[in-house]
């Protein structure tokens, strides 16, 4: 049984930055450090940070006065940001992915101009809630669509003054279908200058598509609440291969591997490599004899942490 590893896989620059912000805050200021929402959607990462003193909350009211608060990588609405700034907090750090912030700026610009904005995204996802919450102009409008059907049912105030943007972790193929529907339904609609689906999402989906061609089964390391991890499993299934989303090696069922000669392995953008290595070890124990890295796009993007956290940890008492 051969093990095929997708490239790229695992952590993206935004996730790396968000985790580093929490880790450095803990090292510099000490526990507890409060984080609004899971900093990234991965159970292993969240549990590890919680053990070190991170406290994950959903409401700003849960944060005691004088505390340090961090916004998660998914971003927050203007209302949440204002609520946090009104509190008596020692420090407030923003771990929002810069590529999510880019979409926030697009929405805020539309709001200032009174242009109605349509967001393609999944209802209830924290990134979507934060992005929708950048729009405040009552003369315009902000709408959420998930499918072409939603587009055809949508009613807006002025079809000649519309723009759209997307959640950063969507399926490239599904989003293309929704954008096609938007352009047919609203011919004058204006899209972003550069695709809102982030480089990491696109690259990992492309890697899974390449991997699935040679794999009999695909294992995606990622948590159930991770949007980009779910999209990877769906993509492998769409090209006709059995695919399973797993939090860890312990989730692997031997029955999945029956009669399989090539096992494809990838990881969502919020899944650490240690989990992938555990999966490889588990597969070797089940008969895997060779590990092959499948070539893919190289990634060298790095996002810096806030300047207050750019200190030599060794110098911290």
UniProtKB/Swiss-Prot annotation:
Binding-site residues for dimethylallyl diphosphate, renumbered to this chain: 41, 74, 125, 226-228, 270
Pathway recorded for this protein: Isoprenoid biosynthesis; dimethylallyl diphosphate biosynthesis; dimethylallyl diphosphate from (2E)-4-hydroxy-3-methylbutenyl diphosphate: step 1/1; Isoprenoid biosynthesis; isopentenyl diphosphate biosynthesis via DXP pathway; isopentenyl diphosphate from 1-deoxy-D-xylulose 5-phosphate: step 6/6
GO biological process, one term: dimethylallyl diphosphate biosynthetic process
Catalytic machinery residues: 127
Keyword match 4Fe-4S: yes
Pfam families, A to Z: LYTB
Reactions performed catalytically: isopentenyl diphosphate + 2 oxidized [2Fe-2S]-[ferredoxin] + H2O = (2E)-4-hydroxy-3-methylbut-2-enyl diphosphate + 2 reduced [2Fe-2S]-[ferredoxin] + 2 H(+); dimethylallyl diphosphate + 2 oxidized [2Fe-2S]-[ferredoxin] + H2O = (2E)-4-hydroxy-3-methylbut-2-enyl diphosphate + 2 reduced [2Fe-2S]-[ferredoxin] + 2 H(+)
One Gene Ontology MF term: 4 iron, 4 sulfur cluster binding
List of residues binding [4Fe-4S] cluster: 12, 97, 198
Binding site for isopentenyl diphosphate: 41, 74, 125, 226-228, 270
Alphabetized InterPro entries for the sequence: LytB/IspH
Family listed: Belongs to the IspH family.
Subunit-level organization: Homodimer.
Known role: Catalyzes the conversion of 1-hydroxy-2-methyl-2-(E)-butenyl 4-diphosphate (HMBPP) into a mixture of isopentenyl diphosphate (IPP) and dimethylallyl diphosphate (DMAPP). Acts in the terminal step of the DOXP/MEP pathway for isoprenoid precursor biosynthesis.
Protein name: 4-hydroxy-3-methylbut-2-enyl diphosphate reductase
Natural source organism: Serratia proteamaculans (strain 568)
Encoding gene per record: ispH
């Amino acid at each position: 049984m051969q093990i095929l590893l997708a490239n790229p896989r695992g952590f993206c620059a935004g996730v790396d930055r968000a985790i580093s912000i929490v880790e450095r805050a803990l090292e510099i200021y000490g526990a507890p450090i409060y984080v609004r929402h899971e900093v990234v959607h991965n159970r292993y990462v969240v549990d590890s940070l919680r053990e070190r003193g991170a406290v994950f909350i959903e409401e700003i009211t849960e944060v005691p006065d004088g505390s340090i608060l961090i916004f998660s990588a998914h971003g927050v609405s203007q209302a949440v940001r204002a609520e946090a700034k009104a509190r008596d907090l020692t420090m407030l750090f923003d771990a929002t992915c810069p590529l999510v912030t880019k979409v926030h700026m697009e929405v805020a610009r539309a709001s200032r101009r009174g242009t109605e904005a349509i967001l393609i995204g999944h209802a209830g996802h924290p990134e979507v809630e934060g992005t929708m919450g950048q729009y405040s102009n009552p003369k315009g409008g902000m709408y959420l669509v998930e499918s072409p059907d939603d587009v055809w049912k949508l009613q807006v105030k002025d079809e000649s003054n519309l723009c759209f943007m997307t959640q950063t972790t969507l399926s490239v193929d599904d989003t293309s279908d929704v954008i096609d529907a938007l352009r047919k339904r609203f011919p004058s609609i204006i899209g972003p200058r550069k695709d809102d689906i982030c480089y990491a999402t696109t690259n990992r989906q492309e890697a899974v598509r390449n991997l699935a061609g040679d794999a009999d089964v695909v294992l995606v390391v990622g948590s159930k609440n991770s949007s980009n991890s779910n999209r990877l499993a769906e993509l492998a299934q769409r090209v006709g291969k059995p695919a399973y989303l797993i939090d860890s090696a312990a989730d692997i069922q031997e029955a999945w591997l029956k009669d399989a000669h090539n096992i494809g392995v990838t990881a969502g953008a919020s899944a650490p490599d240690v989990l992938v290595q555990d999966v490889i070890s588990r597969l070797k124990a089940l008969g895997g004899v060779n590990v092959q890295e499948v070539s893919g796009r190289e990634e060298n993007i790095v996002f810096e942490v806030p300047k207050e956290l750019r200190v030599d940890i060794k110098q911290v008492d």
